[in-house]
């Protein structure tokens, strides 16, 4: 039975709760030798087995599909166009032997969702199913998917290998790797750095979509055009389906909208654009009112272009702009009318107007609780009647009537607000205004007590600035104003939280108390200004207004203290700065009942802790104190020995030099080496016989930033060298001595442990790379087969070629432009690996974050030559706001003397690549 071609064996399968004796087909490929060098496992499966690994589990649709009597009915449950739809329809077609339908589904599947793991599974299954009809295609599929090259040379005694002695550079060109990578149908074989080098305008729809899905930075030429091309493809999932859509600069977003005006209706586009309108990352709009106003106006200007479907967003933008104007004493009637025209479920709106608006297509009620803070930084609207009423009261003081608002607002609401505005302002004929109100409304208005702070009061004061408060007062004959100065140190040290208006003032003596008598009628509401010239110094003050049984408090906080933190050998190092960023040389710091004073340089040192974590501390400068917090760290030391030995100097009997350049770190920060005690160098050498020999030497003083050198004689029959630098340091937090060690190990002459008589060596001669096949005595080994595997920097896949050594034992590899690493396999099966890109392009240790002041020139060291590449080809520099890139700043950089110099950047955050 088993000898017939295409024979399928039989076996029994165990189900969830029972068993079946029905035969199940499985298939075996015969006469196929697959080497053990696969890079990916073929992911084919039998439908009868899917999901049965977990017995009794809820496995969803797979159960319906597997057990359905009519699978066509089961397939109707799937949503067309989804991955599951294509997967199960393809699986069903394969089980029916309908290969043409499978290929049709695969084509649509890849176009819509790319070449996913499920796609590859179906492709693998189909390739195996097609083996009987087209074995060559199946074998080609296996070779491609498993990365099989079959490039090993057969060694035949007495015959020389028939391979070239030099590598053909065309085989490892960018074009050659690209052609091989494109065989997958997408760009999965291309590295991130290689994406920018592709001819983007020549990519098909699938590859273009894959490109956009992988791009992380908007530094691709004609990127908006590429995005529009992808969006217009019938399989596009729309704007926002790729991360790069959100990383476009504002200029690119504008260009995108010009190319495709309909994007203004896309929620994803709107959200992405609004983030680009945010102020600089270094601008705090709580204090910078000018920037806050500009930001609000930018949002309002953009949202004004949106369709009625986005009325909630438009209302949010207008409301927050109105609130800001109100705080500045500005009342924009046109903007207020724009807000009133947006329908929303509130009591004051004219129901007829709202009904008409909601009947229009695409219009719905404004959601007053909609939260857009993630994209605009603005809070939700919430109840808006207080702001609306304040605007009406302001306008109605001067307006002759309220007719212009009647189409939008209930007449009853307008009458009451209009009459109140006139009566409390004492404007016009009082009897006329009384007639607009009911008796109960007039009585309530007369008895109402107002002791309210005006919206236009300043929120922030400088330490030396005089304080004044505007208060709207009504129905108060006698007003008492009291001022309390809070002892900030006592309060903060006891409570460890900021002062608020709920503070208990009982027992505190007011620094000022003054009474005011007024004779206005109970209906009159008057805005009065109160000056407090005594509040011209730093401190926290509570100003309390008491009148006719009501009390209102204002909290005045003037001045601030903050710290700059560093890590030293003795602990956390703090410098205290005031609100003008001036150093406070006499400042102290209070923490957990202990007070730490500044030294003569203004530095406060806080020892490390045995209980690390975030701590709140009180900063004190004179009579003023402020709260701050920091992460109290433990005292953790680490030693990096920085050991280096030139391996080519490790020749038996020769003098070799050991270079040690240690770095001591405390909590990850470099500190002085002077705190090291008893540093010693330990040299452990191990011979071929495995017998170790140890030598321990005192090092003496180690200077910061300098290396020390130790010369030694290389022992005979050496197999391994191990160098260890050890020292001790006093751990103040733990109260003991801590041992520190670091070591470097060098394995040598490993060939002596084997029966091998030759090795393959890599060298670079006159800018070209060569492989030398040499014996143990350095003699050339000609006609040795060498399999070379090469990895290109821009592509994920490798390419293998079979070469041989020439009469001098050399294999010519050429310049190996853009090759990242080489792996060579000699005729004896030994494998060698070299990372050549590091040595070619160099390495520069760069900080991940650079801080600079405005006007400073930032220098970034370059790892290698740029080969006349332009700025855009060499680096990208973007301004970042709220985690997205908003502006291209590549023009700010200049190449000079091995550095990239960046200057003339505005305040903000930037990302350099």
Residue ranges of predicted features:
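N-terminal, cleavable Sec-dependent signal peptides of secreted/periplasmic/extracellular proteins
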Residues: 39, 55-71, 76, 81-88, ...
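Bacterial N-terminal signal peptides
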Residues: 43-51
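Cationic, low-complexity basic patches in intrinsically disordered or flexible, solvent-exposed regions
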Residues: 5, 11, 15
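Bacterial N-terminal signal peptides that target proteins for export
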Residues: 33-43
């Amino acid at each position: 039975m088993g000898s017939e071609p295409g024979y399928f064996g039989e076996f029994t399968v165990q189900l969830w709760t029972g068993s079946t004796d029905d035969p199940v087909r499985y298939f075996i490929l015969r006469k196929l030798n697959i080497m053990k060098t696969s890079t990916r496992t073929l992911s084919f499966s039998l439908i009868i087995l899917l999901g049965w690994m977990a017995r009794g589990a809820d496995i969803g649709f797979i159960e319906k599909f597997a057990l359905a009597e009519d699978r066509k009915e089961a397939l109707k449950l799937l949503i067309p166009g989804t991955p599951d739809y294509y997967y199960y329809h393809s699986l069903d077609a394969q089980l029916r032997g309908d290969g043409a339908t499978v290929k049709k589904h695969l084509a649509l599947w890849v176009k819509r969702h790319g070449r996913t793991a499920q796609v590859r599974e179906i492709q693998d299954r189909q390739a195996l199913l097609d083996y009987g009809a087209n074995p060559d295609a199946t074998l080609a599929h296996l070779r491609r998917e498993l990365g099989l090259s079959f490039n090993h040379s057969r060694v035949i005694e007495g015959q020389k290998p028939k391979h070239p002695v030099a590598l053909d550079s065309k085989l490892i060109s960018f074009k050659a790797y690209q052609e091989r990578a494109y065989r997958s149908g997408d760009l999965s074989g291309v590295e991130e750095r290689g994406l920018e080098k592709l001819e983007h305008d020549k990519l098909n729809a699938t590859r273009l979509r894959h490109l956009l899905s992988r791009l992380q930075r908007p530094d691709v030429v004609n990127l908006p055009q590429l995005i529009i091309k992808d969006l217009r493809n019938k399989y596009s999932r729309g704007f926002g389906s790729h991360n790069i859509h959100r990383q476009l600069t504002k200029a690119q977003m504008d260009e995108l909208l010009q190319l495709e005006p309909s994007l203004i209706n896309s929620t994803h586009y709107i959200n992405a654009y609004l983030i680009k309108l945010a102020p600089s990352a270094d601008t705090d709009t709580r204090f910078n009112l000018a920037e806050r106003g500009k930001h609000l106006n930018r949002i309002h200007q953009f949202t004004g272009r949106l369709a009625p479907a986005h009325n909630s967003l438009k209302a949010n933008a207008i409301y927050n702009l109105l609130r800001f104007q109100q705080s500045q004493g500005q009342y924009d009637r046109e903007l207020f009318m724009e807000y009133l025209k947006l329908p929303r479920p509130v009591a004051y709106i004219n129901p007829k107007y709202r009904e008409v608006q909601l009947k229009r297509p695409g219009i719905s009620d404004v959601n007053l609780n909609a939260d857009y803070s993630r994209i605009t930084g603005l809070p939700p609207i919430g109840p808006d009647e207080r702001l609306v009423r304040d605007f009406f009261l302001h306008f109605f003081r001067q307006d002759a009537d309220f007719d212009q608002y009647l189409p939008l607002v209930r007449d009853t609401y307008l009458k009451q607000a209009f009459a109140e505005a006139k009566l409390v302002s004492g404007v016009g004929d009082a009897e006329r205004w009384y007639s607009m109100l009911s008796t109960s409304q007039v009585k309530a208005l007369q008895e109402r007590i107002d002791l309210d702070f005006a919206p236009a009061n300043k929120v922030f004061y400088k330490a030396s600035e005089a304080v004044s408060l505007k208060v709207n007062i009504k129905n108060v004959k006698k007003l008492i104003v009291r001022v309390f100065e809070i002892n900030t140190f006592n309060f903060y040290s006891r409570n460890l939280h900021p002062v608020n208006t709920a503070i208990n003032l009982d027992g505190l003596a007011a620094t000022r108390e003054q009474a005011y008598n007024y004779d206005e009628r109970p209906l009159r509401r008057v805005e009065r200004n109160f000056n407090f010239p005594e509040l011209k110094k730093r401190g926290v003050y509570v100003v309390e207004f008491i009148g006719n049984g009501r009390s209102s408090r204002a909290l005045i906080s003037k001045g601030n203290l903050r710290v700059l933190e560093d890590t030293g050998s003795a602990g956390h190092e703090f410098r205290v700065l005031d609100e003008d960023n001036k150093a406070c040389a006499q400042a102290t710091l209070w923490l957990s009942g202990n007070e730490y004073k500044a030294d003569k340089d203004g530095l406060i040192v806080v020892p490390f802790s045995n209980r690390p974590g975030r701590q709140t501390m009180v900063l004190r400068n004179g009579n003023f104190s402020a709260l701050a917090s920091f992460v109290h760290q433990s005292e953790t030391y680490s030693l990096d020995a920085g050991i280096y030995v030139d391996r080519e100097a490790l020749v038996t009997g020769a003098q070799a030099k050991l270079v040690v350049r240690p770095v001591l770190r405390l909590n990850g920060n470099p500190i002085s080496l002077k705190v090291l005690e008893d540093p010693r160098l330990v040299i452990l050498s191990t011979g071929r016989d495995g017998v170790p020999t140890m030598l321990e030497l005192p090092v003496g003083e180690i200077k910061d930033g300098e290396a020390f050198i130790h010369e030694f004689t290389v022992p005979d029959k050496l197999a391994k060298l191990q160098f260890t630098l050890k020292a001790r340091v006093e751990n103040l937090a733990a109260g003991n001595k801590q041992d520190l060690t670091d070591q470097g190990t060098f394995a040598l002459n490993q060939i002596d442990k084997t029966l091998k008589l030759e090795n393959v060596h890599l060298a670079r001669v006159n800018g070209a790379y060569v492989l030398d096949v040499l014996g143990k005595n350095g003699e050339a080994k000609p006609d040795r087969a060498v399999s070379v595997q090469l990895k290109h920097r821009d592509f994920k896949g490798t390419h293998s070629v079979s070469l041989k050594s020439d009469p001098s034992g050399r294999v010519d590899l050429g310049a190996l432009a853009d090759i990242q690493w080489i792996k060579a396999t000699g005729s004896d099966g030994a494998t060698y690996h070299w990372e050549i890109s590091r040595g070619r392009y160099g390495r520069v240790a760069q900080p991940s974050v650079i801080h600079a002041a405005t006007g400073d020139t930032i220098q970034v060291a370059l790892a290698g030559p740029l080969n006349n590449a332009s700025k855009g080809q060499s680096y990208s520099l973007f301004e970042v706001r709220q985690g997205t890139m908003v502006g291209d700043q590549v023009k700010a950089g200049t190449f000079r003397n091995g550095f990239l110099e960046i200057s003339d950047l505005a305040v903000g955050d930037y990302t350099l690549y």
